[in-house]
Amino acid sequence: MDLHSRRIISHKVGKFMDIKLVMDTLKMVIYKREDTTNLIIHTDRGSQYMSKEYRKFCAEKGISISYSRKGNPYDNACIESFHATLKKEYVHNEKFENLESLRTGMYEYMEIWYNNSRIHSKIGFLSPNEYEESHKERKQKNCLKIV
């Protein structure tokens, strides 16, 4: 989740929450965002995020790592809140036949509905994509003023 816009940048669904799943998700973030300048990834202290492979990859890409304090989920309140919303609005209301139907459902919820339609008070009652678009427009106008 981009904390500025509340946009879900990348997500993966797998049978196991292992280093491969984490690395695949992180690589997709880099692919979608392209520029990792000033990128900070904040996570809990799960073994996947504490691994040498993860830390080395982030260092090579110039990504700063931030960890929640041990036993303190409030340090990552935005994503904890998102997970609660995801469960309440979607997961608990659906029946998934298999892993593929779960993947499809998660894609539809996050990419099609959440990023495009779910409004947030913290970003002016806009959806994450609307907020990012308006931010880009303001940035472009500011650049034009400078030139």
Q: PLM features: residue spans?
A:
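Active-site beta-loop-alpha junctions of metal-dependent nucleic acid enzymes
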Residues: 12-34
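Acidic/histidine-rich, metal-coordinating catalytic segments
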Residues: 35-50, 69, 126-129
